[in-house]
């Protein structure tokens, strides 16, 4: 379940069958609820304080949102080269089918999130599911190529 920002959201997500939580920020009550219920959680963390709190909960895979608006790959490199070298990231916010590619080349970025595979060429609006397949395949090929070039 995405955008889990309260315990109530988390409870509703579990009732709906969610297998994990994604949150735009780090809310201690939500993290504690997730851990107590054995639910994986991907909290959004963009400050050294957020990251430190997450690590103290035993969470080292974090969401960085919004990545471009808050410094992009340079910010991640500063964190990785400093005290947070053991953190891995999922980056979201402001990404599209082209500007996500630099993140595909970074070992400590596990994934990028965005709606471009569905939004480009009006795929969802037009209910053009074949276009979604084309967009998704193109994205996968771009990632594979970016990782191969390294």
Describe the role of every protein-language-model region:
Residues 1-47:
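Glycine/small-residue-rich loop that forms an oxyanion/phosphate-binding "nest" at active or ligand-binding sites
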Residues 6-16, 49-58, 80-81, 95-111:
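Catalytic cores of alpha/beta
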